[in-house]
């Protein structure tokens, strides 16, 4: 194990003793907010300290087995123990490196998934619908709950824009690298010559704001419009102005909702989406400054970055950020995204580990 990792892990053992003492104090037990915060840190530190204790134990076992090699009667047993200890130490070191990686507190949050049709007209809108279906099926498969916050349908099906709210465990951390430009190459249903067309959609994944950290909206900064909800092709689907559009005047950011049963419900949903978009704007600006100092492998998550190509004639999906190509596109479009998300997460962890080594 590298020295800088061992030094960090030693600090976790010391911190665990401090946290055990803090959790025993009456003043902290009486402050529920502080007690919960310390309890969360205690759980994280306990996991790391426990694995490090196991690592040290296996190092001691390895040293003892190596000492036994000189005894002819014990040599065979010692060889078995050495092989077992070395294999487990490799596994433990890999696990500890991952546990030490910096965590983004937003990773545990629910998320808003915004899909917009881009270049390609009707075909782009159809592909936006396919992406929404792909993500919804994946969420269903992993036990996440999906709610449509707003949807602007196109005449031939699909969406000009759709916003989904995804609720579950570690949603944002798992889906965050889906942000960017998604390009599709296929023969559209309306194509009579059999020619392959290229179109594109953009995806933005935004963490749902925490109530304590949500941006406070000044009513004077908002313009709230009501209008009749409409379906595909623009036809009105009710006779009351229940749909709501909220404009944040200082930034020009807009959110609208027409899927709820009442104007009150639609306004509440539109304000939720607006808060998420404003928070994401702040986050993007902050990360853009950091990205100017270092260019990450996976990219900034900017919706203008082309991140992935879906080639239907070849049954191929290519993620350009990590040079990943897989030939099971139909399964992916049915929601089988696990391999892609795992590869992106592994690339990000490798990137963070490299930064950790440089900084130490």
Swiss-Prot record:
The lineage of its organism: Bacteria, Pseudomonadati, Pseudomonadota, Betaproteobacteria, Burkholderiales. This is Peptide chain release factor 1. HAMAP family: Rel_fac_1 (MF_00093). It is found in: Cytoplasm. GO terms for cellular component: cytoplasm. Belongs to the prokaryotic/mitochondrial release factor family. NCBIfam families: prfA, PRK00591.1. InterPro entries: PCRF, Pep_chain_release_fac_I, Pep_chain_release_fac_I_sf, Prokaryotic/Mito_RF, RF-1. Methylated by PrmC. Methylation increases the termination efficiency of RF1. Peptide chain release factor 1 directs the termination of translation in response to the peptide chain termination codons UAG and UAA. One of its GO terms (molecular function) is translation release factor activity, codon specific. The modification N5-methylglutamine is found at residue 235. Keywords: Cytoplasm, Methylation, Protein biosynthesis.
């Amino acid at each position: 194990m590298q020295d800088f990792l061992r030094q960090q892990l030693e600090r976790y053992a010391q911190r665990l003793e401090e946290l055990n003492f803090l959790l025993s104090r009456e003043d902290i037990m009486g402050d529920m907010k502080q007690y919960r915060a310390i309890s969360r840190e205690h759980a994280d530190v306990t996991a790391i300290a426990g694995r490090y204790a196991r690592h040290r134990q296996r190092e001691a076992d390895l040293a003892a087995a190596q000492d036994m090699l000189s005894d002819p009667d014990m040599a065979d047993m010692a060889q078995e123990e050495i092989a077992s200890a070395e294999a487990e130490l490799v596994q433990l070191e890999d696990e500890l490196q991952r546990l030490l990686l910096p965590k983004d507190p937003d990773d545990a949050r629910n998320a808003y998934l915004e899909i917009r049709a881009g270049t390609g007209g009707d075909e782009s809108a159809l592909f936006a619908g396919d992406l929404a279906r792909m993500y919804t099926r994946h969420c269903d498969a992993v036990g996440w709950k999906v709610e449509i916050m707003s949807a602007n349908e196109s005449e031939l099906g699909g969406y000009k824009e759709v916003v989904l709210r995804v609720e579950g465990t570690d949603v944002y951390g798992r889906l965050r690298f889906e942000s960017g430009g998604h390009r599709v190459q296929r023969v559209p249903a309306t194509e009579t010559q059999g020619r392959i067309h290229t179109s594109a959609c953009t995806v933005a994944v935004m963490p749902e704001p925490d109530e304590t950290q949500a941006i406070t909206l000044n009513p004077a900064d908002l313009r709230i419009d009501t209008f009749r909800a409409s379906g595909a092709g623009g036809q009105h689907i009710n006779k009351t102005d229940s749909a709501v559009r909220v404009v944040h005047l200082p930034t020009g950011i807009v959110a609208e909702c027409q899927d709820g049963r009442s104007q009150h419900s639609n306004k509440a949903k539109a304000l939720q989406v607006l808060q998420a978009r404003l928070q994401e704007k702040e986050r993007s600006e902050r990360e853009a400054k950091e990205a100017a100092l270092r260019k990450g492998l996976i990219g900034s998550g900017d919706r203008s970055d082309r991140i992935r190509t879906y080639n239907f004639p070849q049954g191929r999906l290519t993620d350009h950020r990590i040079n990943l190509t897989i030939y099971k596109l139909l399964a992916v479009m049915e929601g089988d995204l696990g391999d892609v998300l795992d590869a992106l997460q592994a690339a990000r962890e490798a990137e963070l580990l490299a930064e950790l080594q440089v900084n130490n």
